[in-house]
Amino acid sequence: MSTANTAASASLAQHDSTHGTVTWRLMPLLLVCYLFAHLDRINIGFAKMQMSSDLHFSDTVYGFGAGLFFIAYALFGVPSNMALDRVGPRRWIATLMIVWGALSTGMLWVESASGFYVLRFLLGVAEAGFFPGILVYLNRWYPARRRGQITALFAIAVPMAGVIGGPLSGGILELFHDAAGLRGWQWMFLIEGAPVMLLGLVVLKRLPDSFEHVSWLDAGQKQHLREQLASEEQRKSITSFGGILRNRQVWLLVAVYFAVMLAVNTLAFWMPTLIHGAGIGSDGRVGLLSAIPYLAGCLFMIACGRSSDRQRERRWHLCVPLLMSALGIAVAGLAPGNPLMVLGGLIVAGMGASAALPMFWQLPPAFLSNTTQAAGIALISSFGSIASFLAPYLIGWMRDTTHSASLALYVLALFIALGGLLVLRTRAAIVNPQ
C-alpha cells in the first residue's frame, strides 16, 4: 500500500510539474492577448461619454452600434473556428489580432452613425474566432480536472480589462482631450488599439500550435498529456457536428450562455453610463469607480475556480454567480440616482458575471470530443452573441423611450436568473470532472 501511495504521489507531482510548465509558457501571452481583446470591446462604453455628444448619437444609435459587433460575432464564429483547425492556432490567432487591432484603431476616424455601424460589425468579424478559438486551444493542453483554474486564469483578463481599462480610458478622455486636434475618445482608440497589431506579431512568433511541437516538454511529459487527454476523449458522447445539433444538453448550454452574456455585456457597455447617471460627473472618476466591480470580480473569479476544481463540482459554481449577477443588476436599477446603491449593485453583478464566464466554459468540453469542440464551442458562443447584441441595444432603446434604464435592467436580471436556474438541469454526472 505504501509503495502504491508513493507511486501515485510521484505521478501526481509529475503531472503538476508538467502543467505548471505549460501554464508558465502559455498563459502570460494568452492573458495579455485576451486583456486587449476585452479592452477593445469595453472601451466603447467609455468613449460614449464624449463620442455620443460629439457625433450626436442617441442612446439607441450607440446601443445598436455596440451590439452590431456581436451580430458579426454570431455569424462568423463557427467558420472562424473551423479556419483555426485548418490554418493552425498560431497563424490564425495572430491574423485575427492584427486585423482587429487595425479596425479598433480605425474607430478614431468615425464621423457618422453609418461609419460607426460598419466598423463595429467588421470588428466583430475579426474577433469572432479569438475567444472560442483559445478555449479549444487550451482544451488540447489541459485535462478536465485542471480547466476550472486555468480557464479562470485566462478569463481573469475580462475583469482585469475593466480594472486597467476604466482608469486608463477615463484618464485618456480627460488628459488627451483636444491634444493635437484629436478628441479624447479618438486618442483612446489609438492608444488602446495600435498595440494589438504588435501583439499579433508576437503571437505569430511565440505561440506553439500544440504540445507535440515544443522543445520545452520532454518525451515523458508529452506522453502524460497524451494519455490524460486520450482517456477523457473516450468518455465524450458527441463526435460529429450532427450530434451537436441533435443533443439537448448542447441547446441547454446555449440558453445558459445566453444568460451569461447578458450579464457580462450589460456591465461592459453600460456600467460607465450608469455610474455617470448616479451623479458622478468627471470622466476620470467614472473610470476609477468602474474598476471596483471588476477588481471584486477578479478576486471572486479566482476563488470560484479554485473551489470548483477542489470540490470537482461545476453546476452550483455557475448557478450561484449568475443569480448574484441578476440580483446586482436589479439593485442597480432600483435607485439610478443613488451612487451607493448603483455602485453596490454593480459590484455584486461584477463578481457574479466575472465568475460565471469561466465557470460556464467548463461544461461544453464534458460533452464535445476533440473533433467537435471547434464547431461546438463556436456554435454556443455565436448564440451567446445574440444576447450580447440585445443587452446594450435594449438598454439604449429603453433609455431613449422612458428616459430610464431601470425597466431594461429588471428584464435582463430576470433572464439572467432563469439562466442560472437552468444550469441545474445539466447532468451532474457528466459535467462534474471525474
Language model feature labels by segment:
Residues 44-45, 244-302, 357, 361, ...:
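Extracytoplasmic gate region of multi-pass secondary transporters
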Residues 75-114:
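Conserved MFS/SLC helix-loop-helix module at the cytosolic interface between two early adjacent transmembrane helices
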Residues 76-88, 300-313, 399:
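Helix-to-loop junctions at the C-terminal end of transmembrane segments
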Residues 119-156:
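Cytoplasmic helix-loop-helix junction between adjacent transmembrane helices
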